[in-house]
Amino acid sequence: MSFLGLRAYLNLIYFDFLLARGNFASLYQKVRSCPVAMSSSHPDVTEKVCAAVNIACIWYWKEVLCLQRSAVTACLLKRYGIRAQMTIGAQQMPFRAHAWVEVNGSVVNDRPHLREVYAVLDQC
């Protein structure tokens, strides 16, 4: 596992801990306040971060839910200079909620048509 993969895995543990304590507000605040680095050093950093998070999720000892996965992805992208936003959306029938990450209005860690399925509730 690469250094980026290790960072993703450790962030999965951290955000899992917050969610296990029922502390959505802390998770939300951490993602919102995560600073964006001045510049990205690699042109394909978005793909590399998403791939590292995917691999970390495979090796994680339990199922990683969309909120945890999106929080990790958004924070890592911000740390590497990408203005990422964790997006939370919901649909009415049947009721479902989902979280994903967008960069410049495009979904980067999930299916690209999510905005057509879910009404956006918030972005951070």
Model regions: which residues?
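Helix-boundary/low-complexity linker signature
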Residues: 1-124
